[in-house]
Design a protein with these regions (language model features):
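N-terminal Sec-pathway targeting helices
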Residues: 1-14
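Generic detection of intrinsically disordered/low-complexity segments and helix-coil linkers/edges
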Residues: 14-16, 61, 140, 197
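Serine-esterase "nucleophile elbow" of acetyl-processing enzymes
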Residues: 19-109
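Alpha-helical cap/lid subdomain in secreted, periplasmic
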Residues: 4, 94-282
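Non-cleavable N-terminal signal-anchor transmembrane helices
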Residues: 16, 20, 158-161
Length: 283
């Protein structure tokens, strides 16, 4: 009897490991319109304008509603080709380290949405250590580290491309406007705005637009960051990839209007990003 129980438990553990591994694989799959795939294609239309969207998982669009796909669906027929240069977990430092591939795409436009992980890393020592290990950071992630890497990112893009550049302020972490996590994204968005002004690139006020929307809805979120954002985030990944639950349903089940799990976006949030970029391109 004991042997059967042990065997059953072992089988269950194996199944759980397989499901978790499958979820991680799905979450990390590269988008079809990645820089690498773009560069492999032998014939790119010379008539299309190339738009590279730089970012982290919010741009990557596997664990967050894919705003790059919204842009591609809306504008590909208008002579624009969108490249998804988002990679899960990236901080501004990581983007600087992989700029060569992006620059090789010879973009006409570049949008930058980076800093959510930088802000999240600064919220606790535990977060900081995890990001330093997982993302091979050379120093502790803080405001200075973020600011200098955003500045270097823009400097290299201006020096090595002829692209028109826009950088977006950050979506909030969570939806409690008074919480330190939300306020930290506001602080990092101020850094983004200042760097944009100092380097003469366009600034797109995503954080401000989301805040205005949440205030207009008189929204009071049900969950707090302290409820365990990583557990809530991983549960959302499992629900999406194993059960097919939409990002909108995940957001609703967690009591959110814009984010799904504190860090990532539902359709409403992704559309706010896409609308800002679309209006900027057509200005």
């Amino acid at each position: 009897m004991i042997i059967k129980i042990i065997a059953g438990a072992a089988f269950l553990i194996i199944i759980l490991i397989i499901l978790y591994t499958y979820t991680l694989f799905q979450a990390q799959k590269s988008p079809l319109n990645s820089p690498a795939n773009f560069l492999k294609e032998s014939a790119q239309s010379k008539n299309n304008k190339t738009v590279v969207c730089i970012g982290n998982s919010i741009t990557h669009g596997r664990v967050s509603y894919n705003y790059v796909n919204i842009l591609s669906d809306d504008l590909s027929g208008h002579g624009y080709h969108f490249i998804n240069a988002g990679i899960n977990g990236n901080l501004a430092y990581n983007v600087v380290k992989r700029l060569d591939e992006i620059i090789n795409c010879d973009p006409d436009y570049v949008t930058i949405l980076i800093g959510t992980n930088d802000a999240n890393a600064s919220l606790s020592k535990k977060n900081s250590v995890r990001y330093m290990n997982d993302m091979a950071l050379p120093e502790e992630p803080n405001e200075n580290f973020f600011g200098k890497n955003v500045e270097e990112l823009i400097f290299q893009l201006k020096k090595r491309t002829n692209a028109i550049i826009a950088i977006l302020s950050l979506p909030p972490i969570g939806e409690d406007i008074d919480h330190i996590a939300y306020q930290r994204t506001k602080e990092y968005s101020v850094i983004i705005r200042d760097v944009a002004q100092e380097n003469d690139v366009d600034y797109l006020p995503l954080h401000e637009n989301i805040t205005e929307y949440l205030i207009s809805e008189n929204h009071r979120p049900r969950l707090s960051y302290e409820n365990g954002f990583r557990r809530i985030m991983i549960n959302g990944f499992l629900s999406h990839f194993l059960l097919g639950t939409s990002f909108d349903k995940i957001a609703t089940s967690n009591g959110f209007l814009i984010v799904t799990d504190f860090l990532h976006l539902n359709h409403r949030g992704a559309k706010m990003v896409a609308d800002l970029i679309k209006n900027w391109i057509f200005k």
